[in-house]
Amino acid sequence: SWSIVYIVSIIIVIFDDIKKFFKMIKVILTGATGMVGEGVLLECLQNDKVKEILSISRKSCNISHPKLKELLVSDFLKLEDYSAKLVGYDACFYCAGVSSLGMDEEKYTKLTYDTTVHFAKVLSDINPSMNFIYVSGTSTDSTEKGKVMWARVKGKTENDLHKLPFKGQYNFRPGFMSHFKEQKNIKFIFKIFAAIIPSLFPKSSLT
């Protein structure tokens, strides 16, 4: 399993190198009401190198902190309507996502590919010097030709994100992830799996 702390630590190291002439950074975050996004948010709030976090979501994450700002956007495909509020950010953690269970390819593509790539294009136009980090998933299919629908869609998403003119664009493919004890957006069944997966697959786990 991947630890959220581990992922954010890697990204912070990247920022340390890229932003070596600056003391602090401002980041945009999506998915703060989900498990991964909430974990990234908590880590950013605790990290001294992060000056400000703008959480863009369809609903509030219900967390109050001096470093945190919220922008509620009902439709990410209309993000350009909020362009004035997106200026001056150094990075974006795109952690929003949906499960493919019960979805046909058209609907899943709209929610996973169309929404993500449009969101990123808007940001690249406003902040071309930004680093864009996309939380994808293990077994994502970069060839876009495999039999697994969700893997093809995520592969196309990664490929097209990488074409955008950001300062840097990074795709993370975690498998099963552990969580912070402080997190609230964790399903009970996930807590059970999080406790046993490292023991069952120790060579494939990072804790």
Question: Regions from the language model: what does each represent?
Answer:
Residues 55-62:
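Short, polar loop motifs at secondary-structure junctions
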Residues 46-49, 66, 142-207:
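Oxidoreductase cofactor-interface core, primarily capturing Rossmann-like NAD(P)-dependent enzymes
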Residues 5-8, 13-17:
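Acidic, Ala/Val/Gly-enriched low-complexity intrinsically disordered segments
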Residues 27-28, 69-126, 139-141:
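NAD(P)H-binding glycine-rich loop region in Rossmannoid oxidoreductase-like domains
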Residues 59, 98, 106, 110-156, ...:
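Conserved Rossmann-fold NAD(P)-dependent oxidoreductase catalytic core, especially the SDR/UDP-sugar
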Residues 39, 43, 122, 160:
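Rossmann-fold NAD(P)-dependent oxidoreductase module
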Residues 27-46:
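N-terminal Rossmann NAD(P)H-binding glycine-rich loop of SDR-like oxidoreductase domains
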